[in-house]
A protein has these predicted regions:
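Extracellular beta-helix/beta-solenoid repeat scaffolds
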Residues: 1-6, 22-34, 39-72, 76, ...
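A short, solvent-exposed loop/turn motif at the edges and junctions
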Residues: 62-63, 121-149
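Extracellular beta-sheet/turn segments enriched in Thr/Pro/Gly and aliphatic residues
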Residues: 73, 145-162
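Structural beta-strand segments of beta-rich domains
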Residues: 80-82
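Structural motif
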Residues: 84-97
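Hydrophobic beta-strand segments
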Residues: 96-101, 135
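Short, acidic Ser/Thr/Gly-rich low-complexity loop/linker segments typical of extracellular
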Residues: 102-125
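Boundary/junction segments of secreted and surface-exposed precursor proteins
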Residues: 161-171
C-alpha cells in the first residue's frame, strides 16, 4: 500500500501511474500532461487533479472525489468495480443473476461475479458524478438488494441459503449466519425430529 505525499505531483507526457498490491494513494495535488490516453487502475487520488489539454485518463477502481480541472479536449473518467459473491450456507451459488445499472451478469462456479459502472466523468460537458445504485441478486423468485455507492469500488456477499423441501428426518437448524433462507417446496418435519429457527433468521417461502 504505497503513499505519495508532496506539495505537488507534476507528471510529464512520458509519465504514467502504476498501482500494485493494495493500491497507491496520492495525497498531493496532481498536474498531468499526457499526449495519449492513459489507462490506470486502483489509485486513490486524495487531492485535486489538473489535466492539460488533450490529456485523457480512464481509471478502473480507486478513488477520485476531489475537484478535477481539465484543459481543452481533456477528460477523466472513473469506473468503479463491484465484486459479488453469492453463498448457500457457505457454498458458492452458480448461475445467480446480478443486475446493476442495466448490466446483467451471472455468478460462476465459485459463486462470483463482477460488475462495473461509470462513477464519474469530467469532460467538456461538465462533471457528472453518480451516487448510490441498487444492485439486485435473483435466483428464481428469490431476490435480494444491495445499495452501492458507486464512488467507491467494493465487494459484497449475498446469502441465498436453501431449506430442503420434502420430509426431514434429522434436526434442522437455521442459523442467522446464513440468513436469509428460501424454501421453494413443501416441507414436512417428521414427528420424531424438530426444526429450530434461531433469532434473527429470515425465512422466505416461495
Amino acid at each position: 500500500n504505497g503513499v505519495h505525499n508532496a506539495s505537488l505531483l507534476t507528471m510529464s507526457v512520458q509519465s504514467t501511474l502504476v498501482s500494485e498490491g493494495r493500491g497507491l494513494e496520492i495525497q498531493s495535488p496532481v498536474q498531468w500532461s499526457c499526449s495519449q490516453p492513459q489507462d490506470i487502475a486502483d489509485i486513490r487520488f486524495m487531492s485535486t487533479i489538473s489535466l492539460a489539454p488533450l490529456c485523457e485518463v480512464e481509471m478502473i477502481g480507486g478513488q477520485a472525489n476531489e475537484a478535477i480541472t481539465i484543459g481543452t479536449s481533456a477528460s477523466f473518467s472513473l469506473i468503479s468495480t463491484l465484486d459479488i459473491e453469492v453463498l448457500d450456507k457457505g457454498l458458492p451459488v452458480e448461475g445467480a443473476t446480478i443486475i446493476v445499472d442495466g448490466q446483467t451478469v451471472q455468478t460462476d462456479a465459485l459463486g462470483s461475479a463482477t460488475a462495473q459502472t461509470t462513477a464519474r466523468t469530467v469532460d467538456a460537458q461538465g462533471d457528472v458524478q453518480e451516487g448510490t445504485k441498487t444492485v439486485t441478486m435473483q435466483i428464481g423468485s428469490f431476490t435480494e438488494f444491495f445499495a452501492w455507492n458507486v464512488q467507491q469500488s467494493t465487494s459484497h456477499t449475498f446469502m441465498a441459503s436453501t431449506v430442503p423441501s420434502g420430509t426431514i428426518s434429522s434436526w434442522l437448524i437455521l442459523e442467522e449466519t446464513w440468513s436469509p433462507y428460501r424454501l421453494e417446496g413443501d416441507l414436512t418435519v417428521a414427528s420424531n425430529t424438530r426444526m429450530t429457527v434461531n433469532d434473527g433468521v429470515e425465512l422466505r417461502i416461495a
